[in-house]
A protein has these predicted regions:
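Primarily residues marking transmembrane-helix entry/exit sites
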Residues: 17, 73-80
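C-terminal ends and interior cores of transmembrane alpha-helices
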Residues: 56-73
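A helix-boundary/kink motif common to multi-pass secondary transporters
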Residues: 15-16, 46-47, 106, 140, ...
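Loop-to-transmembrane helix entry
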Residues: 15-28, 148, 152
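Helix-loop junctions on the cytosolic side of multi-pass membrane transporters
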Residues: 72, 99, 103, 148-150, ...
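Substrate-agnostic recognition of the 12-TM MFS/MFS-like secondary transporter fold
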Residues: 1-6, 22-42, 46-61, 78-137, ...
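Short helix-capping/hinge motifs at transmembrane helix termini and TM-loop junctions
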Residues: 15, 38-39, 69-73, 90, ...
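Transmembrane alpha-helix termini and helix-breaking/packing motifs in multi-pass membrane transporters
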Residues: 7-13, 66-71, 127-156
């Protein structure tokens, strides 16, 4: 939901394909530059804690955008900085997440777990834009303007991280 809402916001603020591309680039750049370092850290430190930190940062970036939208203070540079920070969090959280999966299942179940993980990732790529569209439609139908509806999408996305964070905090895995 975040990516579609953020793309929409960038276009609403700038009406510029350049800034839309720059936003995507700045989110992907840290992933390209720091994922290998994130992998080393995931191998050396507690993966669950690394992943928790990543989720907290991503929740904070989404919540920051929601607050900026609420106060009508959001500017393009805010979005670009938050995109870079989100990319950094993903660069360190992604390897921790991927390396956590083998710790959660028996070795014989690992191929199925990897397949389910892949399915989950791709289903989320389809559902997220749909959720954003539904959020926009519901809020617009109830009298909210477009910025308020987009603000709701960012706030809902930030709150969705609470489920992941709670689950990770409850997770007790040996050999991390």
């Amino acid at each position: 939901m975040q990516i579609v809402a953020q793309n929409w916001l960038v276009l609403s603020l700038t009406d510029s394909a350049f800034f839309l591309g720059l936003d995507a680039f700045l989110q992907q750049l840290p992933i390209m530059l720091f994922t290998l370092i994130g992998g080393v850290l995931a191998d050396r430190y507690d993966r669950r804690r690394t992943l928790l930190a990543s989720q907290y940062v991503q929740m904070a970036t989404s919540a920051t955008l929601a607050v900026l939208m609420y106060f009508h203070a959001v500017q393009i540079w805010h979005i670009l900085v938050l995109s870079f920070v989100t990319g950094l969090a993903q660069a360190f959280g992604g390897p921790a997440y991927q390396s956590l999966v083998p710790s959660l299942v028996a070795k014989k179940d690992l191929p199925n777990a990897v397949a389910l993980n892949s399915i989950q990732f791709n289903v989320a790529r389809v559902i997220d834009p749909t959720l954003f569209g539904a959020t926009l439609v519901v809020f617009r139908a109830n009298g909210y303007d477009e910025p308020q509806a987009m603000n709701a999408a960012f706030a809902l996305n930030a709150m969705s991280f609470l489920v992941v964070i709670y689950t990770l905090m409850a997770l007790r895995v040996k050999h991390l």
